[in-house]
């Protein structure tokens, strides 16, 4: 939590004021079942045309891709992420073929849609 009081300029739900980004993790492992449950919930997020342009790549600490994914992060993020039980990378498809379209075109909304999934 922030040491500085957070005060909204206008009336909003307290959950927005009290939100925080964790950067400290325990060494407790996360089970495959729990991790896949989180990813399943994300899979159901809304997207334009119900296209779900995102894909998740994940590695738990005890898996071969752990170091590979950790090394993709910038040094600052690597410093705190190395304590996490799992790393999840989110990628998104940048093109889209509308229903009935013969060719794909840029999916200008892919980052917005992908953001709704995490």
Model-identified regions with their sequence ranges:
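N-terminal amphipathic, basic helical "cap/leader" segment at the start of enzyme domains
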Residues: 1-87, 97
């Amino acid at each position: 939590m922030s040491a500085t009081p957070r005060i909204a300029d206008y009336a909003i739900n307290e959950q927005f004021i009290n939100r925080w980004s964790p950067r400290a993790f325990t060494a407790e492992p996360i089970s495959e079942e729990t991790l896949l449950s989180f990813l399943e919930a994300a899979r159901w997020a809304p997207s334009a045309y119900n296209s779900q342009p995102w894909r998740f790549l994940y590695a738990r600490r005890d898996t071969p891709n752990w170091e590979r994914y950790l090394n993709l992060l910038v040094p600052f993020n690597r410093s705190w992420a190395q304590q996490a039980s799992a790393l999840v990378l989110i990628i998104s498809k940048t093109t889209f073929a509308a229903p009935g379209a013969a060719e794909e075109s840029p999916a200008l909304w892919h980052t917005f849609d992908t953001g709704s999934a995490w």
